Amino acid sequence: MGRLVAVGLLGIALALLGERLLALRNRLKASREVESVDLPHCHLIKGIEAGSEDIDILPNGLAFFSVGLKFPGLHSFAPDKPGGILMMDLKEEKPRARELRISRGFDLASFNPHGISTFIDNDDTVYLFVVNHPEFKNTVEIFKFEEAENSLLHLKTVKHELLPSVNDITAVGPAHFYATNDHYFSDPFLKYLETYLNLHWANVVYYSPNEVKVVAEGFDSANGINISPDDKYIYVADILAHEIHVLEKHTNMNLTQLKVLELDTLVDNLSIDPSSGDIWVGCHPNGQKLFVYDPNNPPSSEVLRIQNILSEKPTVTTVYANNGSVLQGSSVASVYDGKLLIGTLYHRALYCEL
């Protein structure tokens, strides 16, 4: 009798494990292949060889790139090279990427930038917020951009127990931001277990020098985050749920969910066209290829444009898609004055004229 019980329990456990594995494959879109959608005027950006995970563009056309992300479980084309911040002036006739100098005293050797966001203060001071994973830990670095010197002055490192697994950030003040935690845990094994069991413990945190609080939760894996041009709404990408959440921002900085847009791809970073309010999304058609890297079958890329997200039927357009032959693992797409920049987790970056 005891053996029958043991065999029965083992069978139940194996069935549950199998069901979770199948569910994870579905969340990763492991069987999906993408059909190419080409743009006619594109070229790879020289100097970006090992990823440009996030991009943010100032109103004057200066674009910031976070490059060189290393992440447990992800491939890297430059595993021994520290990350950095590059800048490109999109108003130039032939824009090129230049690395920004960072002030002395900042630990460049362990710099591992992830999501980024800019904020322009009332006195026109530009702040750059960078999610950083030094030695795979979690901090938010706040810099002052000094345009005349093409440099970043490090102002502050933010660490907090409510920021255990930071992915992306959107700045709403000189030392104020919303950030996504893609996991509840910081330990790599517990992160994997959390993902495997589909616990939906990821969240969004509001940070200010005087208050830190969870303002939205229940996400599978909260990823990209951004704010509408009128500052009324926060958009959050839930990458493994294939969703974009629209949340209303209140005066106390709390968030209330208004709607969820379901998509058929893994949504990564979100960029906003300030002139139209359109959301541009860097997507992963097949997430399994990201984590099990095969140079003969590389991860594909996909860029979506979402118009009128607050309406009953938003318009979703595939602007660009590639099977990995040109661009692998697109994570962000940002537009400025008819120009499109597409960044990746660990591959190249693309410049296109629309």
From Swiss-Prot:
Residues that coordinate or bind Ca(2+) 1: 53, 167, 223, 268-269
Binding sites annotated in the UniProt record for Ca(2+) 2: 54, 116, 168
Keywords, alphabetical: Calcium, Disulfide bond, Glycoprotein, Hydrolase, Membrane, Metal-binding, Signal
Catalyzed reactions: a phenyl acetate + H2O = a phenol + acetate + H(+); an N-acyl-L-homoserine lactone + H2O = an N-acyl-L-homoserine + H(+)
Cellular compartments annotated: Membrane
A Pfam family reported for this protein in Swiss-Prot or TrEMBL: Arylesterase
One biological process term in Gene Ontology: lactone catabolic process
Post-translational modifications reported in the UniProt record: The signal sequence is not cleaved.
The UniProt record lists the keyword Cytoplasm: no
Listed EC numbers: 3.1.1.2, 3.1.1.81
InterPro entries, sorted: 6-blade_b-propeller_TolB-like (IPR011042), Arylesterase (IPR002640), Paraoxonase2 (IPR008364), Serum_paraoxonase/arylesterase (IPR051288)
Glycosylation sites recorded in the entry for this protein: 254, 269, 323
Annotated GO CC locations: extracellular region; plasma membrane
Membrane topology: Peripheral membrane protein
Cofactor list: Ca(2+)
Residues forming the catalytic site: 114 (proton acceptor)
Cofactor note: Binds 2 calcium ions per subunit.
Major localisation: membrane
SS bonds (residue pairs): 42-352
Quaternary structure annotation from Swiss-Prot or TrEMBL: Homotrimer.
Role, per record: Capable of hydrolyzing lactones and a number of aromatic carboxylic acid esters. Has antioxidant activity. Is not associated with high density lipoprotein. Prevents LDL lipid peroxidation, reverses the oxidation of mildly oxidized LDL, and inhibits the ability of MM-LDL to induce monocyte chemotaxis.
Family, similarity comment: Belongs to the paraoxonase family.
Full protein name: Serum paraoxonase/arylesterase 2
Species for this entry: Homo sapiens
Gene giving rise to this polypeptide: PON2
